């Protein structure tokens, strides 16, 4: 009887050992095959920009010819089995705990307390195609108010502020900064007037505060209206509520005009915000680098 009991105990131990080994192996396979989720902006131009960044990082490959209008349907190679999660650009930083990685615009990264230079795992170069612009309604490009605002934003004072404040996470695109004033503008006629501009809080509204100081020297008030979305800043320019806006790049504006039948044009390129790939549940790029 004792011998029989020992045999049963030994058999149970062997079965348990194999069961634990099987569970361990399955867990390893599950971890190895876990889908990597990457959040990207859901608007047309920023999603394409994010996908191009992921391609540059070697994470995916897009079909030939896919450019600034690329979508996730243009992915032809996906060696790491990544799942693209589309979300509102402004909301992406809040998704970091729930995704493996996220591609975030620098302004939203900064607003969320992230440092695009130190915290991003991979970031794009300073592509002029995505420079942030000062935009106005077509027909107003040559008004003194617009030229005065443009001159203030193209000043050395603004360029120096950008370089010192953001240390590479925002880069000035003004080639020849000026004293902030345009000799063709009748500043005396603008004295006592208000120029309204719609902007994103960070860094646009912060940069505009420097332009505001310059305009104040001519007794011109700059009314900075901040918005957290990508739609209202254009609609308030189209309907005349605001003189100008400062929050977007040209590819986004072109797409917006085409989709909304608006008539907004760029009058100046001010800065570029390199888009970055940030870690969520994954803190390194090992999961998408074959390591």
Give each language-model segment a name:
Residues 29-47, 51-53, 57, 155-160, ...:
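A conserved helix-loop-strand patch within extracytoplasmic ligand-binding domains
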Residues 34-39, 190-202, 220-226, 291:
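Short, well-ordered beta-strand elements
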Residues 98, 111-123, 255-267, 282:
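Ligand-binding "clamshell"
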Residues 88-89, 97-100, 104-110, 201-202, ...:
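Beta->alpha turn/N-cap motifs
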Residues 66-94, 224-235:
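Short helix-initiation/N-cap motifs at beta->coil->alpha
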Residues 50-51, 55, 145, 153-174:
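Periplasmic-binding protein-like
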Residues 18-22:
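C-terminal motif of bacterial Sec signal peptides marking the signal peptidase cleavage site
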Residues 130-148, 274-288:
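A bilobed periplasmic-binding-protein/Venus flytrap-type ligand-binding module shared by bacterial periplasmic
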């Amino acid at each position: 009887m004792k011998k029989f009991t020992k045999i049963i105990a030994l058999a149970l131990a062997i079965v348990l050992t194999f069961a634990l080994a099987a569970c361990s192996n399955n867990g390893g396979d599950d971890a190895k095959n876990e889908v990597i989720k990457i959040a990207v902006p859901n608007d047309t131009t920023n999603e394409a920009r994010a996908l191009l960044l992921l391609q540059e990082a070697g994470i995916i490959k897009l079909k030939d010819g896919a450019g600034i209008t690329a979508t996730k349907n243009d992915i032809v190679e996906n060696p790491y089995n990544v799942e693209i999660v589309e979300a509102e650009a402004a909301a992406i930083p809040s998704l970091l705990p729930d995704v493996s990685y996220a591609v975030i615009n620098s302004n939203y990264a900064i607003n969320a307390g992230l440092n695009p230079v130190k915290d991003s795992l991979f970031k794009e170069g300073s592509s002029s195609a995505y420079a942030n612009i000062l935009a106005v309604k077509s027909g107003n490009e040559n008004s003194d108010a617009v030229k005065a605002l443009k001159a203030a934003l193209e000043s050395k004072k603004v360029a120096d502020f950008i370089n010192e404040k953001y240390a590479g996470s925002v880069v000035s695109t003004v080639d020849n900064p000026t004293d902030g004033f345009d000799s063709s503008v009748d500043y005396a006629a603008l004295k006592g007037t208000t120029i309204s501009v719609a902007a994103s809080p960070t860094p646009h509204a912060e940069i505009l505060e420097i332009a505001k100081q310059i305009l104040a020297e001519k007794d011109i008030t700059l009314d900075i209206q901040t918005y957290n979305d990508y739609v209202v800043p254009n609609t308030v320019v189209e309907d005349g509520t605001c003189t100008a806006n400062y929050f977007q790049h040209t590819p986004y504006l072109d797409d917006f005009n085409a989709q909304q039948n608006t008539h907004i044009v760029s009058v100046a390129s001010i800065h570029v915000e390199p888009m970055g790939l940030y870690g969520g549940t994954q803190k390194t790029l090992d999961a998408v680098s074959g390591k």
